Structure formats: structure tokens, C-alpha cells
Amino acid sequence: MTTQEFIDAIKGMTVLELNDLVKACEEEFGVSAAAGVVVAAAGPAEAAEEKTEFDVELTDVGANKVKVIKVVREVTGLGLKEAKDVVDGAPKVLKEAASKEEADDIKAKLEAEGAKVTLK
């Protein structure tokens, strides 16, 4: 059977027959025809949506642990022991649902002391 004959055979099928063909191909080859469609459809929706709230996560303390603890105390309002525990337990989320400006400010302060921060 040539490629053209195969295409002509598909053209002559009903929607139900095409559906059965797709299911048979999925089973035979262990693939899913829907996976590509889902990924393609999800991409533009995410691009159009801009986040307004961020979680600020301390991912790495760096060399200036004492200075990072001071900044963590400042931005979270925690006591010395609690702030030290957070820093020692990195990666940890320091602030949840922070505005973009607040998250950027916290990130800048921590990075100035040598810490690594991720906004999620």
C-alpha cells in the first residue's frame, strides 16, 4: 500500500472509524494522541497569565550566614533562634503570597548578603 492509497483510505472513513483507528494506533504503539494537544493548549494560557503573588524561597545561604540570618529576621519578624533554624533548614519558603515588589525587595536584600533566592 502506498502513502497515497493510505491517505485515500483514511479520507473514506467515517468519524467513528477514524476514532477506532486512533485508539488502535495508541494501543499498538503505546502512545497517546491527546498528549501533544494538551501541551500545546496549555502554553499560551500560561503565557497570558502574569503572576502577581510570589513565594520567596531561600535556596542557599552562602558564606555570610550571620548577615543572612539578620535579613531573615528583618523580613519575617522571627526571633533569632527561629530565623537561625530557617536559615539552617534551607531551602525554605520565607514569605508566601508576597507582592512582586515585596518579593523583589526581599530577594535583593538576601542576594546582597550572598544568599541565593528563588521566587515561585
From Swiss-Prot:
Source organism of this protein record: Lachnoclostridium phytofermentans (strain ATCC 700394 / DSM 18823 / ISDg) (Clostridium phytofermentans)
Transmembrane regions listed in the UniProt entry: none
Name of protein: Large ribosomal subunit protein bL12
Stated role: Forms part of the ribosomal stalk which helps the ribosome interact with GTP-bound translation factors. Is thus essential for accurate translation.
UniProt family annotation: Belongs to the bacterial ribosomal protein bL12 family.
NCBIfam families: L12
Subunit structure: Homodimer. Part of the ribosomal stalk of the 50S ribosomal subunit. Forms a multimeric L10(L12)X complex, where L10 forms an elongated spine to which 2 to 4 L12 dimers bind in a sequential fashion. Binds GTP-bound translation factors.
Coiled coil region boundaries: none
